[in-house]
Amino acid sequence: NMQKLTKKTIEAIQAAQDTAIEYQNTNVDQPHLLYALMTQENGLIPQLMKKLGKDATVIAGSLERVMANIPKVTGSGRDMNTVYISQSLDRLLNASEAIAKNMGDEFVSVEHVMLSYFDNADKDIKQIFKDFAIDKDSFLKALQEVRGNQRVTTDTPEDTYDVLKKYGQDLV
């Protein structure tokens, strides 16, 4: 349900579709969306990865290798600008909506999508999480530091996270 997604989540899904088209894949799948989250300009996920001591661009590089191995579909019978959401990604997005609801949030934000990967990741992404030592508990801890007790009640919640850090001034 697109009305329940934040602007950054919609941006990430659109970027994932563009990436799938670029890689000549017929489906938008989990690696495409995680890549979009890791490379999102001014995105929350790269910020959280940094808090965890991880480099989102290096993780994105691993995802590029995964996407390069997804079968390509070319030829005259294919509409090059049409891609479909895979069943795996559809399940992940549905899980994201459930996570948002459980957290008392009104919109599905990028952190909900990221959290849904921990329980719904395909084998390639599980391996990337293992290789980079990314786990749900440390991610939740970093998220709590940035988000605090705020709830997602608008479609632009990422703008309000860590506001003191962005605009505050140390008076000491």
Regions found by a protein language model. Name each.
Residues N1-V172:
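Histone-fold recognition with a strong bias for associated Lys/Arg-rich disordered tails
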